[in-house]
């Protein structure tokens, strides 16, 4: 980093290159910040008090994309909280309290079952509307106010919604895509307050949906039928499904002019194409729309070229876990937005999921090459009692249900990541200088040195007592 500072002073490095180098360093220096807590009750004077954002479990998180100041969390207790992240400034010991909240006891129109997804309306500079789905079979639009969160409209879906997505493209048609326990992707019109139509194509529940950032009419979806389908919402009926991703296709759709005469490109849409050998739990686009990243219950994360649909064959290693569970939910990688990493160094964060062996791990991985960058561990888990063999860890701090990215954390001095956990806590991961946060290897070396000093001191005392 010192060389970049010198070159910046000399004017030999561009501002964008310096910015990428700095933000890359900050991402690589992400570490747990256990002193930053989120508590939905009045903060305790005891620093050892963990503090719980939700009583039954924190399920989902969303941060406003304009200033990154406000975060919304949804819990298994059907509550929704709004948090002001700027109230902390740059302190590393702070307990956040919700600015406003709603639960089934505070409002008659509130959700009655666990929250499954949450997002903040993307077109307001100051967040004013939040969108939530729940196991009660509804999608709700709620107004964010200083003292309360007030539902203003409810879409009754008559099925279980697992996820939803609203495009932030300037030409967005203001349609909310909802993945449900039904086979079709549901489209809800925010302007009319009605359900417009469904997108057929899947043969089972849809767990993840994501609008293309560069095309407001293109939607990607992942399902328990192991398929990823691309839809064009301008088309009707079965014609809306325009392409499927095939994990066995590393070439993709090739133009006849550039392909050999003997080569026959596969059909864009095929009912036999499979993206994973297990349910697809997550679908995400990169910021520029050039790549599509999917996660499946075959313990694989796959990266696809959006232009051709080719599987890039990036392998992230055997450390990835995403096991089958009786509890269906969206589990998608968190892709760091464009501009924070250098060209060709796109990075993603993945929270491992294993019903019977939760370890509280988040992996930082390079998207194009699959290179392992670092592992983040939830602090304090090793000191706790190990889970009972054969029992689910759904209510454990080791269960990471959701990740949220904040690029201007600590009053613009660093980057932050927030994680929602099964025990109801929301934890913070903040970038620190290398001298503030020793690496795992340094910690092991320090522990080894201490052990040797203790042995030598014991031997010395033995000689002195003779």
Regions found by a protein language model. Give the residues of each.
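Intrinsic disorder/low-complexity signal
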Residues: 1-15, 435-466
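WD40 beta-propeller repeat fold
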Residues: 1-191, 198-200, 208, 274, ...
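Beta-propeller blade-edge and WD-like acidic-aromatic loop motif
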Residues: 190, 233, 303-317
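Intrinsically disordered, low-complexity acidic Ser/Thr-rich regulatory segments
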Residues: 256-280, 285, 386-398, 408
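Solenoidal tandem-repeat scaffolds enriched in leucines and small polar residues
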Residues: 155, 159-268
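Beta-propeller fold detector
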Residues: 92-106, 151-155, 197-199, 240-261, ...
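Flexible loop/N-cap segments at domain edges
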Residues: 287-291
